[in-house]
C-alpha cells in the first residue's frame, strides 16, 4: 500500500501532489476549473500540517469542501475499490539498490495504471542521482498504451541518459512500440535492440514492424529462422549479430526459472531456508547438488571474501 501524499510538507512534493490529484479527478470525468484547483490546493496545504501518517487520501477527502470532488476521490480511498493500494499511512518503498514492482494487478485494472505508475515514476525519478541505473519496463505495452505515459517516457528517453540511466523496454510484440505515439522517440533513442526469434517475422504485418526498426529482409529472415529460447539478434550502430548466451545448467537454474511453478518453488525454498542460503538450496532443488557443494565449499573457505565486503 502506497502513501503518495506523505511528503507534501515539502514545496516540490505538494506541487507534484496537486498535479497528481488533479489527474485522479480528470480520470473520473471531473471538469477541472481554476476554482477546483484552488479547492484542492487549499486542502493539500491544510493536510500538509497534519502528522505524516495522516496525510492520506482519506485525510484529503475529509478536507475537501466539494461533495462532487469527494465522490470522485472515493474510489481511491479505503472506502473504494483502489484504496488498498493508494490510501496507505506509511512509506512502503524500500531504498534497496534493486527495486521491483509486480504489475499484474495493474494490467487488469486500467483505472489504476495511471495513478500508480505516475507515483512510482515520481519516486524513482528522485533516486536518479548519477549512479549507473537500469530502468526496466517489462510488458512495455502497459506504459505505451496510455497517452500520459507516452509523453513521460518520451521526455525520459531524452534526459535520463544524462543521469546515467539506461532505459530497457521489454515487450512481447514489436507492434506495441511500432503503433505507439512515441514510436519515433523510442526508435531514435534506443540505439541498441535485441530481437527474439519469431517464425512469423516474414509475414506482411509482422514485417512492417521490423521495417520500422530499420531491419532489412536478410535480417528479418535471420530472426525468422533463429532458435527460440536460445538465439538472440542484436542490432546497433556498431554492427548486428545473431548470438547465443550458451548458458550452462547452473546459469539456467537461475535465469530460466520464470514460470509460475518456478516462482512458487522459489518462495517455498526461501521460506524454508532463508534468503542467505537460497542459492545453494535452489541448486539442490534443481538436482545440481555438485554445484551446491562447490558453492558451499567456496563460502566456507577461509580465503573467501564476499564481493560486497570486497567492494567496500
Tell what function each PLM region has.
Residues 174-312:
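C-terminal regions of RecA-like/P-loop NTPase motor modules
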Amino acid at each position: 500500500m502506497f502513501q503518495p501524499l506523505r511528503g507534501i510538507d515539502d514545496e516540490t512534493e505538494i506541487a507534484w501532489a496537486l498535479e497528481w490529484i488533479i489527474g485522479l479527478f480528470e480520470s473520473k470525468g471531473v471538469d477541472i476549473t481554476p476554482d477546483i484547483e484552488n479547492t484542492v490546493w487549499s486542502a493539500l496545504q491544510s493536510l500538509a500540517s497534519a502528522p505524516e501518517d495522516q496525510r492520506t487520501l482519506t485525510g484529503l477527502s475529509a478536507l475537501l469542501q466539494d461533495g462532487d470532488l469527494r465522490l470522485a476521490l472515493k474510489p481511491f480511498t479505503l472506502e473504494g475499490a483502489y484504496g488498498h493500494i493508494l490510501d496507505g499511512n506509511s512509506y512502503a518503498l524500500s531504498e534497496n539498490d534493486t527495486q521491483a514492482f509486480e504489475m499484474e494487478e495493474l494490467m487488469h485494472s486500467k483505472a489504476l495504471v495511471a495513478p500508480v505508475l505516475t507515483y512510482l515514476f515520481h519516486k524513482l525519478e528522485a533516486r536518479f542521482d548519477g549512479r549507473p541505473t537500469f530502468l526496466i519496463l517489462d510488458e512495455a505495452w502497459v506504459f505505451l498504451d496510455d497517452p500520459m505515459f507516452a509523453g513521460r517516457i518520451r521526455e525520459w528517453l531524452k534526459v535520463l541518459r544524462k543521469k546515467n540511466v539506461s532505459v530497457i523496454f521489454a515487450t512481447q510484440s514489436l507492434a506495441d512500440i511500432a503503433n505507439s505515439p512515441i514510436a519515433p522517440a523510442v526508435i531514435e533513442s534506443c540505439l541498441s535492440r535485441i530481437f527474439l526469434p519469431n517464425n512469423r517475422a516474414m509475414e506482411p504485418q509482422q514485417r512492417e514492424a521490423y521495417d520500422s526498426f530499420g531491419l532489412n529482409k536478410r535480417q528479418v529472415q535471420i530472426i525468422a529462422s533463429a532458435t527460440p529460447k536460445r538465439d538472440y539478434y542484436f542490432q546497433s550502430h556498431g554492427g548486428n549479430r545473431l548470438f547465443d548466451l550458451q548458458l550452462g545448467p547452473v546459469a539456467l537454474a537461475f535465469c530460466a526459472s520464470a514460470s509460475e511453478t518456478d516462482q512458487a518453488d522459489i518462495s517455498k525454498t526461501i521460506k524454508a531456508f532463508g534468503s542467505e542460503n537460497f542459492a545453494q538450496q535452489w541448486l539442490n532443488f534443481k538436482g545440481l547438488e555438485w554445484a551446491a557443494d562447490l558453492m558451499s565449499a567456496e563460502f566456507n573457505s577461509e580465503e573467501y571474501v564476499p564481493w560486497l565486503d570486497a567492494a567496500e
